[in-house]
Amino acid sequence: MLRSLVGSEMCIRDSFMAKSGFSGKNILINLIVTIVAGFIYFYVELPPINLHSAAFYSFFLFLSVVYCITAVITSGIYRQAENGKTFWKLLKGSCIVPLIVIGAVFVIYVVGGLLSSVVIRSGAYAKLITVETGDFTQDIEEISFDQIPMLDRDSAEKLGDRKLGELADMVSQFEVADNYTQINYKGRPVRVTPLRYGDIFKWLNNRSAGLPAYLIIDMVTQEVDVVRLPEGMHYTTAEHFSRNLYRHLRFQYPTYIFNEPTFEIDEEGTPYWVCPRIVKRIGLFGGTDIQGAVLVNAITGESQYYTDIPTWVDGVYSAEIIMDQYDYYGTYQGGFINSLFGQKNVTVTTEGYNYIAANDDVYVYTGVTSAGSDESNIGFILTNQRTKQTTFYSIAGAEEFSAMNSAEGVVQHLNYSATFPLLLNISNQPTYFMALKDYAGLVKMYAMVNVQQYNIVETGQTVAQCEENYRKTLLNNGIIDSTDAEVPAEEQELWEKK
């Protein structure tokens, strides 16, 4: 009788395994297909193996779905199932593990999202950034004309494309990449950008030598320098396969979440990719912040992770992360309920931003306005892109776009458009400085608008002329005295030589 019972049990088990496809051979096939598909997915999509990344959960869901689809095919349960109920029963028998994984991933994702929610963690979001207060006239020094960056990004791109067009040995094979990172290089505000391959065929022709040069655009003199490299850049965002920068990073740092890499050069002119490491400070998915950066040599591919960023690096914290963190700070200082009702002391950043070079670093500048979203600012912030040191300056005045409209109104007969302003200290007066462009995007004039009294606007064909006119207008309105109204002689002489 015992043998009969054992035999019956084995028959039932074999029958279930046959019906459900739960056999060693089928499982092996399912696993092989899933592993191959997973490797292809990982190679193409490059998800970080990190619980704080949504892409990681998508990767696991993809693997589970592939396994289930393969199991349905290899087991033949789609032929055996008489109805939906039977199909689901057989599917559970073949895919119990991946189905559990899908359920677990869903639960973790939902719970993690709730624990990261600003609704219940508003206080933590408000503490992501530390904001100090500063004095504008003491902290922001007047800078000489040869330090004022007159080029915006669009103008720099036009100059870069024009320069490449002059190089007969490069223009047929390469294009200018659209990085144009603003940095301080040897005490000068410049934008730097590498070349990229014109297309896949030009990549095939030139990949062994790499990208031969990068461009430096001086934002003051508007000069473009093509820096030819003794050895080409082999690791860039324009590369393919293992030399693609994103793939190179992922296989070297599989658990790191990276922000968008930026192209920079050190003081010797060696090209690097600065790859900020993203961490989540709040729950699983909330409180995006930066914790160090990986520096990748664009020529050799050598990389190193730094928690203490070298001083020559300028861009670690992106403007978007800085503005998001300040918006959390300004919005949730009084709690989540206050951000919706009452909105006492609730402030947010304005829509635009710009960069200011100071003390061999690059700072993000943006205005701060009240939650009412009127056309005036209550002040502005400056944030060091390398250290995230943030200072708020309480200066009530015109919002940047209002200042742009004021400048455009002065030259409305010419139909010029204003660039997003740069904040300067002119005679201890916070002043918006901007270029005025024609319909073709060429800079034709310059304008200065007083932040606190944006009806005070002056323009000029040159920066020197613009500032001279602006100082005279400040004098005529009793804002400054005659001593401050004069442009320093050494600066006047400098620009006359130019």
Please give the residue ranges for each predicted region.
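Soluble extracytoplasmic regions of secretory-pathway and membrane proteins
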Residues: 20-498
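Single conserved hydrophobic/aromatic residue that forms the stacking wall/gate
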Residues: 1-14
